[in-house]
A protein has these predicted regions:
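Amphipathic, small/basic residue-rich leader segments at the start of a protein or domain
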Residues: 1-74, 90-91, 95, 99
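A short, Trp-centered hydrophobic/proline-enriched beta-strand micro-motif
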Residues: 103-112
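Short solvent-exposed loop/turn micro-motifs enriched in small/polar/acidic residues
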Residues: 118-121, 164
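Long, well-ordered alpha-helical segments
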Residues: 2-12, 88-95, 131-137, 170-180
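Short, solvent-exposed loop/turn elements at beta->coil junctions and helix N-caps
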Residues: 46, 112-116, 141-142
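A structural signal for short hydrophobic beta-strand segments in well-ordered beta-sheet cores
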Residues: 125-128
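Helix-loop "lid/cap" segments that line or gate small-molecule binding pockets
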Residues: 79-88
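A short core secondary-structure module
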Residues: 133, 137-181
Length: 182
């Protein structure tokens, strides 16, 4: 069971050591967890996942919480992978989801800005179309696991049309892209 695995692999002393480490988690333990299928728990089988539901995800998260496990699961699976699953293109799903399920790709959501507002009106970072891509201008703060993420899912304001919840886009940005500072 998840509880038995975490009790054995993630004792309190191990958790404290991971918290002191600059990476913030154990890559070896993360790989074991992905081999158990946890990173792809909710992804469809066609993307290397198990095809389970939010119920199974919640059970697993309860056990994570019980063990105080520091890992890239929340950032990579919940705030990066699930938005791609539910809103990404077919090509994005095919590219990112199998790599996440296999433990070969880490991602995170860059949402918080200096205003610290989680409301749509708090998204001020701008994205302007340029040469087939976008130029992003602004600052994101408190981006969980940004220092280890291969890709950031960045919430930006791409249009001023409509109300404050309109004109917001999520852009995939390589973690090593020019201008990305961690």
């Amino acid at each position: 069971s998840a509880r038995d695995f975490l009790r054995q692999e993630c004792p309190t002393t191990h958790v404290r050591a991971m918290e002191e480490d600059l990476t913030g988690y154990s890559p070896e333990l993360w790989q074991k967890m992905t081999e158990l299928g946890w990173a792809g728990l909710m992804f469809p089988e066609q993307y290397g996942g198990s095809g389970y539901t939010f119920v199974e995800l919640c059970v697993l998260l309860e056990e994570y919480g019980r063990s105080l496990l520091p890992s890239p699961f929340h950032a990579t699976v919940l705030t990066f992978g699930l938005p791609i699953l539910f809103g990404g293109s077919a090509a994005q799903k095919a590219h990112y989801l199998p790599a996440i399920a296999e433990g070969k790709h880490l991602g995170t959501l860059a949402l918080t800005e200096p205003s610290a507002s989680f409301e749509p009106s708090g998204v001020h970072v701008r994205a302007v179309a340029h040469n087939g891509g976008f130029v992003i201008d602004g600052t994101k703060l408190f981006v969980t696991n940004a220092h280890t993420a291969d890709t950031l899912l960045v919430a930006v304001r791409s249009s001023d049309a409509g109300g404050p919840a309109d004109g917001i886009s999520l852009l995939l940005v390589p973690g090593n892209a020019p201008g990305v500072a961690q």
